Amino acid sequence: MPKIREIIAGKKCVIYADEQPQVLLIQPVGEHEDATLDAEIEAIKGTVNVPFVFTGFAISDWEEELTPWYDPNISPRQSVGDHAFDTLGFITEQLLPYIFERYGKLPVVLGGYSLAGLFARWAVCKEECFDAVAAASPSLWIVAWKDFSDAHEVYARYVYLSLGDREEITKNKAIAQVGNNIRWEYDHLQRTIGLDHCTLVWEQGGHFVTPHLRLARAFAWCINSLTKSRF
């Protein structure tokens, strides 16, 4: 699968593309994730038989660019929570038109790990252009997540959630809520978008165990769900 590095609207991007792709995957990528992207793509390809195009775009400030609202447990910086809409705007106004022009209009999966997973899950309540969300170990422990989720419709057709089975075992009281919150979220999604349109996978270990493989499994589930629903 060819790998292309490009600058799109000032952001560093990496594109992996099969011929005649049927699905577009989008992922915010931090510096710590760049080294494992090749392995992530190989893991996806080893799971699905559907051609796809993957586009990752660089995130330079993980907290600033991905956190949807202020939470001092994420960062004490007051600016954190003000710029997720800027990131979402880059995707909808710059990245998607660019990719669609090159590869055609495709079903879109927005995915991410940790704060990027939170961002992806939040984004599908703000824009209707995403068909599925791949939220691996999303930071759903953010303050007021349940209130937000309960008040906002999910526009995506499919939602994948996962969490390590030891992630909620922590002395950090804020992060310790992630298990209860993701269980609540899964129940909420079953009621709102349907049992066949969402899943919650419990991975082994803590938060930092093979994130790229967890995310690959998330993307693969979304690809399979979207392509099956088209036939």
Where in this protein do the model-derived segments appear?
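A domain-start/cap signature at the N-terminus of enzymes
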Residues: 1-23, 52, 56, 198
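Serine-hydrolase catalytic machinery in alpha/beta-hydrolase-like enzymes
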Residues: 19-102
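Short beta-strand immediately N-terminal to the catalytic nucleophile in serine-hydrolase-like folds
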Residues: 107-112, 136
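Gly/Ala-rich beta-loop-alpha elbow adjacent to hydrolase catalytic centers
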Residues: 111-116, 120
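The feature captures the conserved acid-bearing segment of alpha/beta-hydrolase catalytic domains
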Residues: 140-214, 222
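Catalytic active-site module of serine/aspartate enzymes centered on a nucleophile-bearing elbow/loop
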Residues: 214-231
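The conserved beta1-alpha1 loop
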Residues: 26-30, 137, 163
